[in-house]
Amino acid sequence: MNYPHEFDVIVVGGGHAGTEAALAAARSGAKTLLLTHNIETLGQMSCNPSIGGIGKGHLVKEVDALGGAMAIATDEAGIQFRILNSSKGPAVRATRAQADRVLYRKAIRHRLENQENLWLFQQSVEDLIVEGDKVVGAVTQIGLKFRGRAVVLTAGTFLNGLIHVGLQHYSGGRAGDPPANSLGQRLKELKLPQGRLKTGTPPRIDGRTINYSVLEEQPGDLDPIPVFSFMGSAALHPRQLPCWITHTNERTHDIIRGGLDRSPMYSGVIEGIGPRYCPSIEDKIHRFADKPSHQIFLEPEGLDTHEVYPNGVSTSLPFDVQYELIHSLPGLEHAHILRPGYAIEYDYFDPRGLKSSLETKAISGLFFAGQINGTTGYEEAAAQGLLAGINAARYASDREAWVPRRDEAYLGVLVDDLVTRGVTEPYRMFTSRAEYRLSLREDNADLRLTEIGRELGLVDDIRWDVFNRKRDAIQAEVQRLQSTWVNPRLLPEEPAQALLGKAIEREYALADLLKRPNISYEALMQARNGAGELLAGPGLLGDDVLAEQVEIQIKYAGYIERQRDEVQKHVVHEQQAIPADIDYDAVSSLSFEVRQKLKTHRPETVGQAARISGVTPAAVSLLLIHLKRLHYGKRAI
């Protein structure tokens, strides 16, 4: 039957991409339907119980700045928080949290069930309704037809999913869930370019059978306690737990080597390529054969469970080998395995077949987000889901898509990398992928994106008010420090020596003093003048977030300004559109190889064309000349 109501946006899948897509579309004002095979697993953390990390935490902060759910849900569910790279510069510092799986799922479901314009329905999707080259709905396993103006597909690892444990394999979307084989077959019929990828997960351990006395404890950060959401606070955090560290040894490695002949990876059973930066334990032992030991993190899965996730031993080895290797680890000699580790192969679609909006080029109104695009990780999925949800809603209401630039957000870097370069292995975000990372920091994600989110209809009044007060306070303090001056009379030799390590010989703005590498904002605010009074006043002391932002903006002002100038030089051609119907064969001055690459990838902008492997700067110049001729030719007509 046909469902009696139509929707603007239909989201298929309730993982990290699907939930953010549904929330974003609904917040944008679109009548949205989220279809999931099981409402109980909405927001499920299928693999590791953690959110964030280098590059990944930046994406989570950006999703949050645009009104998304992942960061605040992590604050409500996080049982350990840490800042990675805390001793390095602000551009590469990153937040990471261990999360209670049950609390996280509960936090996400609460937001889904209380979001206006959003309907939930439990049914697996087996088919898409496509009319001509346009998607108009989805069909569930009982033949129920839902019609909508746009469809966002976030199928994760479910498309023709195949689970491997040793040389045994069976169909599944993840352990305990059926695959989406019918939908996978339907997508193949649409002639979308596709391939196979692989990911894996470790066996889970009963924490009551671990000997913690021989392990190294790894507590979370306490001063200050990190917070993920710009709307969050440490008061939201549940009880905190430590993680623990153990190591592999030569016996572990011998056990693994002895089982490689029954490994689906090394016996040729698995076709898909796995994530480079999250390799299986057998892959690590094989690739780094000279390394005598590998670190393993034992991560608690939640407050009300004894289950422990051994991060670092993802494996698809036979269970008897898994059993032996786990028991070879210090502290785990008598550990009970609750669930076996496994690898899963699944279909993905070449993201070069997508527009930058994440709409497929072949089928109008069909958007892809998450692992279906060849990425790995909850954070990458959530970011894509948010963007796909925004643009599906805009498509449904005949509005222009929003696409962040590489200099605006890690989300812009992520999408541009995918649609321009494609993937040959699961894509993971790192700060090193962003050429403008000094400007794209975790700490300023809201200052970069919340105003845009407000314009897109994603940011509610409460968040908008909090953001405005924060932004105004930072701007006022920066201006005060830039316009307040001190001279040798106000700061005589003795207090100057205490603050600066030497006397000042002329007048300085407080901002100039703060730019010095050995001066912190806190030290400047606590400095006294010759009369024993505060030199700069209390300022924003007491609010670590605002104080940090003021210090970063002033200390890095010169570097950021140079980067801004660099962006301005590139942005003119970066965003210059290339007509969808351009005839590259008419650009005879381009080499045959370059013309073939451009015809294959069909870049949307000159910036995208420039990042295609093999397209040289000289070729870009020739393309610009041709586009200029086309422009003037149209004007003449």
From Swiss-Prot:
UniProt KW keywords: Cytoplasm, FAD, Flavoprotein, NAD, tRNA processing
Compartment list: Cytoplasm
Keyword Transcription regulation carried by entry: no
Binding site for FAD: G13, G14, G15, H16, A17, G18
Main location: cytoplasm
Amino-acid positions noted as binding NAD(+) in the UniProt annotation, renumbered to this chain: 274-288
Protein name (database record): tRNA uridine 5-carboxymethylaminomethyl modification enzyme MnmG
A GO CC annotation given for this chain: cytosol
Alphabetized PROSITE patterns for the sequence: GIDA_1, GIDA_2
Known partners and oligomeric status: Homodimer. Heterotetramer of two MnmE and two MnmG subunits.
Example GO molecular function: flavin adenine dinucleotide binding
An annotated GO BP: tRNA wobble uridine modification
Its job: NAD-binding protein involved in the addition of a carboxymethylaminomethyl (cmnm) group at the wobble position (U34) of certain tRNAs, forming tRNA-cmnm(5)s(2)U34.
Species name: Bordetella avium (strain 197N)
Alphabetical list of PANTHER family matching this protein: GLUCOSE INHIBITED DIVISION PROTEIN A, PROTEIN MTO1 HOMOLOG, MITOCHONDRIAL
UniProt superkingdom: Bacteria
Family: Belongs to the MnmG family.
Cofactors named for this entry: FAD
InterPro entries linked to this entry: FAD/NAD-bd_sf (IPR036188), GIDA_C_N (IPR049312), MnmG (IPR004416), MnmG-rel (IPR002218), MnmG-rel_CS (IPR020595), MnmG_C (IPR026904), MnmG_C_subdom (IPR047001), MnmG_C_subdom_sf (IPR044920)
Record carries keyword NAD: yes
